[in-house]
């Protein structure tokens, strides 16, 4: 463990780890009950009033930061917490509570020899450190997944959501205490220095989850020896193949971009090829009507002069706003090459009625989510039926895509014997049976 970690943060982490062990050993129904209790608490008028009042204070303070130019207006959209968002979070908690418990599940049982049985059994990762952006609803999602899987969690939200996070953390602590569990299983850290301190807790913290800007994620990865789960960018593509249906293309483009422009799974680049002009025309018309600023290549602008010229860095930009880059490609091979070079391995989609082209796209694009005739916005733990997500990972290890319950578990090997020793096996000795049970 690095000496950078503060004494307070180290003590908080050790206390959280101990609380997490008790949570891990609690009956599955207790962990599921915690989530139901939390969902019910968030539906109480008094709790909602306190949470919304705290959120209003955060938003009011953020307006001053926007005026000073120290905060983006798009960040405030993520910060806002309303009844609809809270209801969605509660639904996710109920969905998680209803899932079969995955902790302690035997995923392999093998006889090595008569009376020597090997089992692979799922277990929690242990203690997570989660650093997340402005969205206060993310705190509840993260805590819900951690509690359901028997993990403890250190939470560090952004300064802009400080009041909201305090209010939500208080609800979580009340629910844990009411069940007779240690509220330190979910610790809210507020000092900016705590981030560096948590990153230095290798040997205590088992996983870091980083949710924020590309620059921030790169900083986290470079500053810790703890495994990091994150996505560094959300540059998602929608590719209009020549066999794309215009009406479908337009609907997918608008939903992918405008249902929530600040989301990491929002569309950032629209690709089209010769033969897809009708789909392009319908898509751009619908996007313009939805208030999207279009930035295009020369070929796109030749067909649609109202489109603004795309700067050199357009294809590598995650706008997080109602702005979209549009580029013509020669064919599917150039589309694949563009996505390989400029994509972030998050989510990319093809629009086509050609099954061969769809299959090629689905097998060739190396992203966490690869879609055919579907909006990029489906890349979400709740929509995948995971109940919630701790984040979206563009890594290939240990989890990929929306990270739900499975991504917060690892496994142990349990061996049941009757005094066997390795010296009994080998040349001239006993033979392993290696029979799956």
Spans of features found by a protein language model:
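Short, well-ordered beta-strand elements within core beta-sheets of diverse protein domains
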Residues: 19-25, 270-272, 321-330, 345-350
